[in-house]
């Protein structure tokens, strides 16, 4: 039996919005497998949806450059928001991004090696660890970029108006699509969601045959919700992004979205445990 920790229960609660006891029970039944617990909670109606894994906890910046025919995003991390605004840290981050733009195709390993000496010197000066974490390139006839407070960076590639593509980049920053078009959603992702929706319908009392027919309509809605062109446009929710693009004679071929600290989880201090430790367990 896997250990069901308080942090695991908290993560499940954060991702599903369900109560603490429901989350603990679901984790026990799933033997600590949080993804299985989420699926089971959705099937039973305890959770309507779940946020994607990977809490954003690390600090740092996302920077972007657009050159002729391509764009690049660079993520540089540090430990605190204070250092993320430091002139020395930002200076190095900009230097790294300029180098990446001037040397298209540079790998993250090569980028880290190129600036290791300067990084180490800045760490010694500031007294806080930092690292060049990610670099991502995007090719395209027209490239638009959007930075949201240096915490989210988006590149959108396509054809047509750069100004209209920038609006789409702003949409990507806000709505986090996973695919460009509904038909791009992988068969594996679709089938996984389809099975969950069938179980939800069956658990609500519908016969299997009827449940399967009901789900077909839901799956079209699902693929639209996770794809860029199928989503409601944030600047005009009455139309989809796809319809907006058609109206301005513009198309999107691909996009990249990076957010500071994706997939990195800072160690959170357990306040109650710390108090118990200090007081000898008598708190």
Swiss-Prot record:
Keywords: Cytoplasm, Elongation factor, Protein biosynthesis. It is found in: Cytoplasm. InterPro entries: EF-Ts_dimer_sf, Transl_elong_EFTs/EF1B, Transl_elong_EFTs/EF1B_dimer, Transl_elong_Ts_CS, UBA-like_sf. Pfam families: EF_TS. GO terms for molecular function: translation elongation factor activity. Residues 80-83 are annotated as: Involved in Mg(2+) ion dislocation from EF-Tu. One of its GO terms (cellular component) is cytoplasm. Belongs to the EF-Ts family. Associates with the EF-Tu.GDP complex and induces the exchange of GDP to GTP. It remains bound to the aminoacyl-tRNA.EF-Tu.GTP complex up to the GTP hydrolysis stage on the ribosome. This is Elongation factor Ts.
């Amino acid at each position: 039996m896997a250990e069901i920790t308080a942090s695991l229960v908290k993560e499940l609660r954060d991702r599903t919005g369900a109560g603490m006891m429901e989350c603990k029970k679901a984790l026990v039944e799933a033997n600590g497998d949080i993804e299985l617990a989420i699926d089971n909670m959705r099937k039973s109606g305890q959770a309507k949806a779940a946020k994607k894994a990977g809490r954003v906890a690390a600090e740092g910046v996302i920077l972007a450059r657009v050159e002729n025919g391509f764009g690049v995003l660079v993520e540089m991390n540090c430990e605190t928001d204070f250092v993320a605004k430091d002139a020395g840290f930002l200076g190095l981050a900009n230097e790294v991004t300029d180098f990446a733009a001037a040397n298209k195709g540079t790998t993250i390993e090569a980028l880290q090696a190129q600036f290791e000496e300067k990084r180490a010197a800045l760490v010694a000066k500031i007294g806080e660890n930092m690292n060049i974490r990610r670099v991502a390139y995007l090719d395209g006839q027209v490239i638009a970029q959007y930075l949201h407070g240096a915490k989210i960076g988006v590149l959108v590639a396509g054809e047509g108006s750069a100004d209209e593509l920038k609006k789409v980049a702003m949409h990507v920053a806000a709505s986090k699509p996973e695919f460009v078009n509904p038909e791009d959603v992988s068969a594996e992702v679709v089938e996984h969601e389809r099975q969950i929706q069938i179980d939800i319908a069956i658990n609500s009392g519908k016969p299997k045959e009827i449940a399967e027919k009901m789900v077909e309509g839901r799956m079209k809605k699902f693929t639209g919700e996770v794809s860029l062109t199928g989503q409601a446009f944030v600047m005009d929710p009455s139309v989809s992004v796809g319809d907006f693009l058609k109206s301005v004679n513009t198309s999107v071929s691909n996009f990249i979205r990076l957010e500071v600290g994706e997939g990195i989880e800072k160690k959170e201090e357990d306040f109650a445990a710390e108090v118990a430790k200090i007081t000898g367990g008598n708190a």
